[in-house]
């Protein structure tokens, strides 16, 4: 099976041995090429987990900074989500579909999950949440993200990054 790539899509070409015909099917959806280049420029693998410590917040801060927003410095994921929820933050909460559309147009879109479990010793008194940057549509109706964490990747589905958690989406501007 041959794999053809462009900056926005990945598809496979398969030859049916019984008929000799060739067909293509989409393996992943579409992502914004400029956002993808921004993600590549930060070398997201440098934010991969070290033991039980994860750095999703730092990866999102690095990407956001490259896109002109520097307001996440020093915040953990839960604090980032709370900040984006705050009036006057410059972010607004949107649906998954709107997040996809805004990311495909090149806007900074952050996916976030606020962990409500209490944990002493944390900056916000809660167990770690999670954040990632939406860069397009992974599959129909499913946001594609770049993330650091237990799994660190430049392109994957929101489900790969957050599992079944209740994710909120925030667009800048």
Name each model feature, range by range.
Residues 10, 14-78, 114-117, 126:
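N-terminal capping segments
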């Amino acid at each position: 099976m041959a794999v053809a790539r462009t900056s926005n899509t990945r598809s496979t070409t398969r030859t049916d041995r019984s008929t000799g015909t060739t067909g293509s099917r989409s393996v992943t959806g579409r992502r914004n090429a400029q956002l993808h280049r921004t993600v590549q420029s930060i070398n997201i693998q440098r934010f991969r987990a070290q033991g039980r410590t994860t750095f999703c917040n730092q990866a999102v801060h690095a990407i956001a900074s490259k896109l002109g927003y520097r307001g996440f410095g020093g915040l953990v994921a839960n604090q980032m989500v709370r900040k984006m929820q705050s009036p006057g933050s410059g972010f607004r909460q949107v649906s998954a579909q709107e997040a996809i559309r805004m990311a495909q147009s090149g806007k900074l879109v952050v996916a976030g999950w606020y962990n409500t479990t209490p944990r002493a010793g944390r900056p916000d008194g809660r167990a770690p949440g999670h954040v990632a940057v939406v860069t397009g549509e992974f599959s129909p109706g499913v946001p594609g993200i770049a993330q650091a964490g237990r799994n660190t990747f430049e392109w994957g589905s929101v489900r790969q990054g957050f599992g079944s958690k209740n994710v909120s989406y925030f667009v800048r501007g």
